[in-house]
Amino acid sequence: VKLGNMQARRDWGFAGDYVRAMHAMLQQEKPVDYVIATGTSHSVYEFVVEVLRSLNLIPAGADVAQVVNEYVEVDPKLFRTGEIHDLRGDAAQARSALNWKPEVDFSGLVRMMVESDAGIAANQSAKPQFAGKA
């Protein structure tokens, strides 16, 4: 897989958690702008490591960086100009006013994404393949 800046850090969150926050916002008497975020950031590199762990591709005792290098090629052409290195939101106001907090952590989110993609891939490979036009 070709990726750009593996050190870029993002506030990765689960859409279902954000939908719960949006619903809570809509229940307020007066509209208020809230930051909805996990409050923690993880690098693209950490994301890749979690994906590889979820797929059991990092053997016990293995050099993690070496395993990552087997699967990922960093392509400088994919780096964003003017990229903000660390994007992390502060959802303190939403946590307080809406009594909201994210339920799915980073590892859980990655695991859900991997399992979802594995299910999609399994469904696609189970479909009959036709030669020619359908």
Question: Which stretches of residues belong to each language-model region?
Answer:
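C-terminal substrate-binding subdomain of Rossmann-fold SDR/epimerase-dehydratase oxidoreductases
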Residues: 1-134
